[in-house]
From Swiss-Prot:
Taxonomic source organism: Mycoplasma genitalium (strain ATCC 33530 / DSM 19775 / NCTC 10195 / G37) (Mycoplasmoides genitalium)
Subunit structure: Component of a cohesin-like complex composed of ScpA, ScpB and the Smc homodimer, in which ScpA and ScpB bind to the head domain of Smc. The presence of the three proteins is required for the association of the complex with DNA.
Its job: Participates in chromosomal partition during cell division. May act via the formation of a condensin-like complex containing Smc and ScpB that pull DNA away from mid-cell into both cell halves.
Predominant subcellular localization, coarse grouping: cytoplasm
Compartments it resides in: Cytoplasm
InterPro entries: ScpA
Family label: Belongs to the ScpA family.
Lineage of producing organism: Bacteria, Bacillati, Mycoplasmatota, Mycoplasmoidales, Mycoplasmoidaceae
Chain positions covered by the region annotation ScpA: 143-471
Protein name: Segregation and condensation protein A
Keyword Cell cycle applies: yes
Annotated keywords: Cell cycle, Cell division, Chromosome partition, Cytoplasm
GO annotations of cellular component type: cytoplasm
Origin superkingdom: Bacteria
PANTHER family in the record: SEGREGATION AND CONDENSATION PROTEIN A (PTHR33969:SF2)
Length: 471
């Protein structure tokens, strides 16, 4: 998302700049701030903690690009490398990014703002007005019939709902500071303004994410009550016991609702997808033995990695944001490699799960992207750019960037090679047998549900009938 902060005077005084940076500090730390060269010179001290992109026609030699500073004179190149920008509007930058703006944040909006800021105001809709310090702020989102904008606006956050959820997962924002009621009202406003067939996909995605935040907050509040049990316990009236029971019932209701929303969303997607397309992809390596002759460096098993990716895909099936509109998109393995490495670098060479790395990406994860990411991981592993940690077939994938000190080359003896291959074959046979067993249980349960639906809840299958006769 490209957000442009616009002051009614079309310029920022130093005091206003400091107030803005303090007010939106949490969300600005996750984005790239774009300023022109004069603004950078004036606000250099205040902008130091943030990732910056400085526009300069002459590419001033005193500016040394580094991990936190980019110097550019071509805005198109900047957009290729950055998807999330916050632009401090000056006349030069407004002219550059006029057609690329997704969101306007107007300081002290007035009826004359439209005359002072030269853009097509008919393309934007006012989402909310809020206050901070001595200023009013108006949030305007670009209208779109394909992807309705859901910009969450709270006291200390503005941005996409997916960005807020990512910050909550990384614990950069406390779930106790999130006003669920405020987010729900903004969600209802989105439904009221974008009720059409093209927008229903995004609206259901937002519902699932909002439900996850709600369940996370309910779980957190439940833990807080448990810590205060000693103080609130009242033996005579059992006030604490009654309160805990009410909280548990409410928490279960939130969790059940989340599962139901995800189930309904997946069922709706099934009407627009090919039959068993997803299941066929997942079962590819589970129904038959796959022989892999060549191993990755350090004898990492390709089959082991493939099975772990399948398990991750099954868990993320309900949250994959699949666009059903027919579009042509270029997606290369090299591009995905670059995005994965940049996401891993944000964890400072620490070992991190693949699930958290995917949450760091700046766009929704589609099925096509997920499959391409698997190929990109194979290439990165083969080139020894990243390392992989995984205990067994069922454990989660953990990856990290390799440096020269971590690069190791193992040389197996013939006996060790035979033992490793035999162990891999045994693991492979065990996992296939277990998958067949789980599939049989699943088919049996599916048949029982069908018969109960057809003949009523009182229907008893053969197993239950034997139990009844024995009793």
């Amino acid at each position: 998302m490209i957000s442009l902060i616009f002051d009614k005077s079309n310029s920022f005084n130093p005091q206003l700049c400091v107030e803005l940076l303090n007010h939106f500090k949490v969300v600005m730390l996750t984005k790239t701030i774009v300023v022109d060269y004069p603004s950078f010179q004036a606000w250099k001290a205040q902008l130091k903690p943030f990732k910056l992109a400085v526009f300069s026609d002459n590419l001033q030699t005193e500016l040394t690009p580094n991990s936190k500073l980019t110097v550019f004179n071509n805005y198109q190149q900047l957009l290729v490398d950055n998807n999330d920008l916050i632009i401090f509007a000056t006349p030069t930058l407004v002219q550059l990014f006029d057609n690329e703006i997704d969101q306007l944040i107007v300081i002290n909006p007035t009826s004359k703002s439209k005359d002072q800021f030269n853009c097509n105001w008919n393309d934007f809709v006012l989402i909310k007005q809020t206050n901070f310090k001595n200023h009013q702020v108006g949030y305007f989102d670009k209208k779109s019939s394909y992807e309705p904008p859901f910009t969450v606006v709270t006291d200390h956050f503005f941005g996409n709902l997916t960005d807020l959820f990512s910050l909550l997962v990384d614990k950069k924002v406390s779930v106790n500071d999130v006003d669920i009621g405020l987010i729900s009202l903004q969600y209802l406003n989105i439904i009221a303004n974008y009720t059409n067939k093209k927008a229903i996909e995004k609206i259901t995605d937002y519902l699932v994410i909002t439900s996850k935040i709600l369940a996370k907050k309910a779980d957190n509040l439940l833990n807080d009550h448990q810590e205060e049990s000693v103080l609130e316990y009242d033996l005579a009236t059992n006030n604490f016991r009654d309160k805990m029971i009410a909280n548990l019932v409410e928490h279960k209701r939130y969790c059940d609702s989340l599962g139901e929303f995800e189930k309904l969303r997946v069922n709706r997607l099934a009407y627009f997808s090919k039959a068993n397309e997803m299941e066929q992809f997942i079962k590819t390596a589970n129904d038959q033995l796959v022989t892999v002759e060549d191993q990755l460096p350090n004898y990492i098993s390709v089959l082991k990695l493939f099975h772990a990716m399948n398990k991750l895909l099954e868990m993320r099936l309900s949250s994959l944001l699949t666009n059903k509109n027919i579009t042509i998109k270029e997606l290369s393995v090299e591009q995905v490699q670059k995005e994965l490495v940049l996401a891993i670098k944000q964890f400072n060479y620490q070992t991190v799960s693949l699930k958290r790395v995917l949450l760091k990406l700046n766009h929704p994860i589609s099925l096509m992207y997920f499959v391409t990411a698997f190929v990109a991981l194979l290439v990165l592993l083969n080139n020894q750019v990243i390392g992989l940690e995984q205990k067994d077939y069922h454990s989660e994938l953990y990856i990290f960037l390799l440096d020269e000190n971590q690069l190791k080359t193992f040389q197996e003896s013939p006996d060790e090679m035979v033992k490793r291959i035999q162990a891999q074959q045994q693991q492979n046979e065990l996992i296939i047998a277990k998958n067949k067993q789980l599939r049989a249980i699943k088919n049996k349960q599916k048949r029982a549900d069908y018969l109960k639906k057809k003949y009523g809840e009182n229907y008893l299958d053969k197993t239950n009938l034997k139990d009844e006769n024995n009793n």
